[in-house]
Amino acid sequence: MTQTLPTPRGSLTPNRTLADLTWLRVGGPADWLFQPADEADLAAFLAALDPAIPVFPMGVGSNLIVRDGGIRGVVIRLGRGFNAIACEGGTVTAGAAALDAHVARRAAEAGLDLTFLRTIPGSIGGAVRMNAGCYGTYVADHLVSVRAVARDGSLHEIAAADLRFGYRHSDLPEGWVVIEARFRAEPGDPAELAARMEEQLARRDASQPTKDRSAGSTFRNPAGYSSTGRADDSHELKAWTLIDAAGLRGHRLGGAQMSEKHPNFLLNAGGATAAELEALGELVRRKVRETSGHELKWEVIRVGRP
């Protein structure tokens, strides 16, 4: 990338490999990696950046495959200036870089129930963008509003209703960067909330490959059977049962593998490339389609050049 970019107060690194910033440890470099110092730095940089240059907001890489050819343009990764957590009254305000688990714990200490966030990997910005959820509770159930910086550097406050949440979906425009989210939370006893989170962690560890290198659930549950908080919240059919029925539990392609413990988890079992991970995922989709007629949709975000 040869364009001249604005000079920020934060860090701007050319040709920065991204593999070490993703949970799967795969992927090529970003043309540029921008880590803004604070909100004003982010807004000024985007306002001055050539509109033709693409931007990709990246969280902690917990639900992401960066392809081996890397990402064009500027990857934006928020850090310390965006991880504050404040609890006041019945609300919790969290910076987009705050980890979901940290927000859940801080809220519980303040006697506020956001326990559903405890077992969700990743940070608040990504959780808002994809309406993350666990055990039948979703970001959409608690979100009041978000603050975000648009691609042109303008600052916006968006009510939760305007994000039009669906299953693993929000209408947040491409290139907009969430910087803060405000949640409503019911009161609860801190000790009881802490105990509930410990139970959730034990339940997760018993059923998911939490010690392996994965990006969480690979595929969405089939439409009409997925938990959305609406009438179709039936939980009668899960992606993992379709993968298992297709005989793909533990299936391997190069260094990529579908987990033996939970077949909807795609693993880097050792030395995998992004191409191998994506190819195994597509093989799973094809086999499930052939054996069940269901079309699995990726939940893991795949981005970049092959």
Curated annotation (Swiss-Prot):
One Gene Ontology term of the biological-process aspect is: cell division
List GO molecular-function terms, semicolon-separated: FAD binding; UDP-N-acetylmuramate dehydrogenase activity
UniProt feature, compositional bias: Polar residues: 215-229
The record's active-site residues are 168, 217, 299
UniProt keyword Flavoprotein present = yes
Q: Which UniProt keywords apply?
A: Cell cycle, Cell division, Cell shape, Cell wall biogenesis/degradation, Cytoplasm, FAD, Flavoprotein, NADP, Oxidoreductase, Peptidoglycan synthesis
Task: Kindly name one Pfam family recorded for this protein.
Answer: MurB_C
Signal peptide (residue range) = none
- Ranges of residues in domain FAD-binding PCMH-type: 25-188
Major subcellular location class: cytoplasm
Please list where the region (Disordered) is annotated. 199-232
Q: Is Membrane a UniProt keyword of this protein?
A: no
Q: What is its EC number?
A: 1.3.1.98
Bias kind Basic and acidic residues: ranges: 199-214
PROSITE patterns from the UniProt entry = FAD_PCMH (PS51387)
**Localization (cell):** Cytoplasm
| Pathway listed | Cell wall biogenesis; peptidoglycan biosynthesis
Q: What class of enzyme is it?
A: oxidoreductase
Highest taxon, organism lineage:
Bacteria
Q: Name one GO cellular component term.
A: cytosol
Q: What's the cofactor?
A: FAD
Tell me which InterPro entries the record gives: FAD-bd_PCMH, FAD-bd_PCMH-like_sf, FAD-bd_PCMH_sub1, FAD-bd_PCMH_sub2, MurB, MurB_C, MurB_C_sf, Oxid_FAD_bind_N
Catalysed reaction(s) here are: UDP-N-acetyl-alpha-D-muramate + NADP(+) = UDP-N-acetyl-3-O-(1-carboxyvinyl)-alpha-D-glucosamine + NADPH + H(+)
Q: Which family does it belong to?
A: Belongs to the MurB family.
Provide the function of this protein. Answer: Cell wall formation.
Protein name per its UniProtKB record: UDP-N-acetylenolpyruvoylglucosamine reductase
Organism placement in taxonomy:
Bacteria, Pseudomonadati, Pseudomonadota, Alphaproteobacteria, Rhodobacterales
Q: Which gene encodes it?
A: murB
